[in-house]
Amino acid sequence: MTRLLVECTHVFKHPTINSGIQRVVRNVIKQLPERVGDVECLPVISLRGQLYRVTRLAPLDAPLLNAVAAFGERLERLAHRFWQWHQRLDPRCPSKLTRRVLYVAYRLISFGLFGCPLRLIRLMNRKQLLKRCTPLQHQPGDQLVLLDSSWHSDFFPHAEQLKRDGVGIVAVIYDLIPLTHPQFYDTRLVQVFSAWFDWITRTADGYMAISATVRDQLRAELQRRVGPAHTDRLWFDYFHLGSELDLHSARATVEPRLQQLFSTPEPVLLMVSTIEPRKNHTYLLDAFERAWAAGCTARLCIAGRIGWKCDALLARVHNHPELNRRLFMFNELSDTSLEHAYAHASALVFPSFVEGFGLPLVEAMQRGLPAMGSDIAVFREIGGEFMAYFDLQDPQSLADLIIRFQQSGQFPAARNVADWRWIGWREASAQLTERTAHNVLKAPSAPARPYAHCP
């Protein structure tokens, strides 16, 4: 009997991370159906070359261990920022010797401040992890659905062994942006993603994308890399994401500064995303500055954690004359505070250069909040005539929409967002499993192709 083994390793290890892929994985697993027809659906993780069935995705009710785990996650974020600092300094070194000294200093400090404590924390966490899962024996005909961000080379040999044992490999593709737009990412992430994508193109039997746009981009990329003959032996499909904020709690309090922002009558346009170059906050500020110069009183609220390559933008925001007057930024909002922002904002604005889906658009529009977005294919797929679109080559295009919206009180889209409908996470999880099962049961199996760096 075919089983869908839906992999969620990273989210299982880091259940409190609440952005991007992690939000998708957590919600799909929570709503995973027990079976689709005759196909059983099981959430699984890969630990040290063994599959485990997840019995509890959320952390245990152990305050001390949970506090240690939370501290470990903060320490990992600090370690990443320290690495980013090193990456910024390295190109400025005047000689190879200076660069080498900087690298050695970075490694020594990193090992002392982060390496040793993180190893100890991971050892403590391992005991908790094993209380939330049970060993699972794979079977020929099983299908391993790589839902999580499995961009780790230590996972490759295990997946290939499963494939040699008759397990099919299904890759969930969120986007190809590190390949198509590498300028938006750190060099190391591009290298990691590229290595993973090279591996997955040789290993996967089929692909599930998170939008029809990404599915089509993926098929074209594989045709370019491995040729039409090989690509035609694979299957490609997609599912759409849900929109509920699952970590919202009625008992949690709203960020006081955010509450104060929405207590006055002037309109607030909201942007929700990680702060990084691809999201195009610079364009957003340019557009709002033009609108403000024209007398517009609409305010801009930027909500999102601090990402990468954003020092200049953060400096611009922190030194902006409109900061805390008509410009506001929040970097650590809870789901409860985010729900409050969606409920009280006048519109969402999303000027991203490129996306695989655009989850904030769905979260906003599902709550009746109209959205303005970049005129890109995937946003047209999601919003259709219910969104307003602007030209990324001209900030005045967005400024004009903002001014017209405030002056007329009518949102500048062809159709009313009240008539727009979207699926929830239960339907999203059903789409993923049903379409995967359908494609797996009709597709021929493909031979294994070992990863080049396997021992």
Walk through the language-model features, giving the residues of each.
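Carbohydrate transferase catalytic cores enriched for Leloir-type hexosyltransferases
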Residues: 1-455
